[in-house]
């Protein structure tokens, strides 16, 4: 891995995430979108807990509240985006979801120049709003917006948990919380699907690796060898990679307006990331980059 360029590792992490999403969608007919999200969360949470074995005996009330809040955001983000995938193309859903962290960055900006990126992102939203997906699958768009809100909440809570809890213990506990949150909604369909087709355990085990374990490892390796500014810009390619994964695996094409919207949101994300890094380098306050 040391010979692989860091940008390649970062791109591989994003490709892995979107491939996992596309593979999961191929089995929605067997377990439903919520059942699929539940299986992914259960397998991912159990594997992470076994690897990390979080030490929670001496946690304070504030640490517990932070981990639970992070878990709620994580669970909502996973369930809502999978429900969105069921009715709209992955590329469109991820573009809408990206508006969560992008809006969070823009809300905290203190520079007028970032209004340009806000307008560009708004243009993307408007184009998505008048595109064919929004007209024919309003429910999917709504769930993607909910996922965007959860992603923004996840970022806020992740900063708090990262500062309050050392290592990845907080993440391991939050994954367990996300799993518990999903169980009342997806357990029955997940169990019914696995009983009919036990191979689904292997499929969603692979999804958990592609969507969680492998990207996390690749991102850690990449961040050790590249500036976070460059990493943030590469992360902004997420919607485009999602669209390509949807096209390659699910044969999901995007309408011209949706492609333009994707480009607008991606460009706004790149702009916010670069602007924030320049501001930090000059000692001024700035926005936070769009996270992975």
PLM regions with names:
Residues 27, 36, 40, 84, ...:
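Hydrophobic/aromatic residues within transmembrane alpha-helices
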Residues 1-35, 72, 76-80, 123, ...:
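Glycine-/small-residue-enriched transmembrane alpha-helix faces in small-molecule transporters
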Residues 6, 30-76, 103-104, 150-157, ...:
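Transmembrane alpha-helices of multi-pass small-molecule transport proteins
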Residues 99, 113-132, 245-247, 257-276:
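Hydrophobic transmembrane alpha-helices of multi-pass small-molecule transport proteins
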Residues 42-47, 96-107, 177-181, 234-249, ...:
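Alpha-helical transmembrane segments of compact multi-pass small-molecule transporters, enriched
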């Amino acid at each position: 891995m040391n010979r692989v360029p860091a940008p390649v590792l970062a791109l591989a992490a994003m490709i892995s995430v979107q491939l996992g999403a596309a593979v999961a969608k191929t089995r929605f007919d067997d377990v439903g979108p919520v059942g699929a999200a539940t299986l992914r969360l259960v397998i991912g949470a159990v594997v992470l807990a076994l690897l990390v074995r979080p030490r929670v005996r001496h946690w304070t009330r504030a640490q517990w509240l932070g981990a639970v809040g992070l878990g709620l955001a994580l669970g909502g983000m996973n369930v809502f985006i999978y429900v969105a995938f069921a009715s709209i193309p992955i590329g469109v859903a991820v573009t809408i979801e990206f508006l969560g962290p992008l809006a969070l960055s823009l809300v905290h900006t203190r520079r007028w120049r970032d209004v340009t990126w806000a307008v560009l992102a708004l243009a993307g939203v408007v184009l998505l709003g008048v595109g064919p997906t929004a007209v024919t699958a309003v429910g999917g768009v709504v769930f993607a917006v909910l996922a965007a809100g959860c992603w923004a909440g996840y970022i806020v809570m992740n900063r708090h948990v990262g500062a309050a809890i050392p290592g990845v213990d907080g993440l391991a506990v939050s994954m367990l919380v996300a799993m518990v949150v999903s169980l009342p909604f997806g357990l029955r369909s997940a169990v019914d699907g696995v009983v009919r087709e036990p191979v689904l355990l292997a499929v969603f085990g692979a999804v958990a690796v592609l969507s969680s374990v492998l990207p996390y490892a690749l991102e850690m390796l990449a961040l050790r060898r590249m500036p976070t500014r460059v990493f943030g810009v590469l992360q902004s390619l997420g919607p485009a990679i999602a669209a390509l994964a949807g096209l390659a695996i699910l044969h999901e094409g995007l309408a011209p307006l949706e492609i333009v919207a994707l480009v607008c949101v991606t460009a706004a994300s790149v702009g916010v990331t670069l602007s924030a890094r320049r501001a930090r380098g000059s000692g001024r306050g700035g926005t936070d980059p769009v996270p992975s």
